[in-house]
């Protein structure tokens, strides 16, 4: 994914962290669904990375058609305390040089990236309740935020709405169940827009959850991450419910087109 951060009703803040070049080695690979992969990278030099939950790193790779160097950014899905190994969650985009590059990496391969970067990160100073809304692999930076929150026993009530298409697209559900067990103030709902027979969970677009379950936003801080249509529609819907800080990360597929 190629993320672009935008904010509504908040000031754009500097991440205040230097961008470095890192060398890392692929430690493990797991296929989570038919097109989503988890990649764990162990840092070699430097051996650790300091980042804020929600930030991203960038890879460079050659364009197979023109030969020019391309840059693609991927959100860190692991928590900052796991500073020696970082996790990426990403899906395969047909014709996408970034996901193609990452999908071809094998355990033991070495690679390089730059980071951390990005203004889409968890603000810890606010006392507002937290609402996280994700579509698809937009869960990646939000996962980092949720894990960081759980580690420090954040007392703020937090809710996650995550939209996927069908049962074959489900992943990380056991982890979310465990997070809700460990954190009584955390609620997670996964909704499927095109559920198949046998699905007993929430159905419909993730916007439906916002419409039905969020009466007021006056005491909320909202984090949105996903495709451009979801970001635009969710922002408009939230605006109708009142004023609150909204932090947005709009994903693009790595062909350069909005991931709709």
What are the residue ranges of the model-derived segments?
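Ferredoxin-reductase
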Residues: 11-107, 194
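Reductase modules of NAD(P)H-dependent flavoproteins
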Residues: 8-10, 18, 166-260
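A short, basic/flexible loop-to-alpha-helix module at the beginning of a structural domain
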Residues: 115-126
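Conserved S-adenosyl-L-methionine
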Residues: 151-157
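A structural signal for isolated positions on well-ordered beta-strands in alpha/beta enzyme cores
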Residues: 87, 112, 131, 159-161, ...
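Histidine-anchored nucleotide/phosphate-binding helix
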Residues: 139-150
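Short, conserved phosphate/pyrophosphate- and ester-handling motifs at nucleotide-, phospho-/glycolipid
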Residues: 54, 138, 227
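Residue-level signal for short, function-critical loop segments
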Residues: 63, 92, 136, 164-166, ...
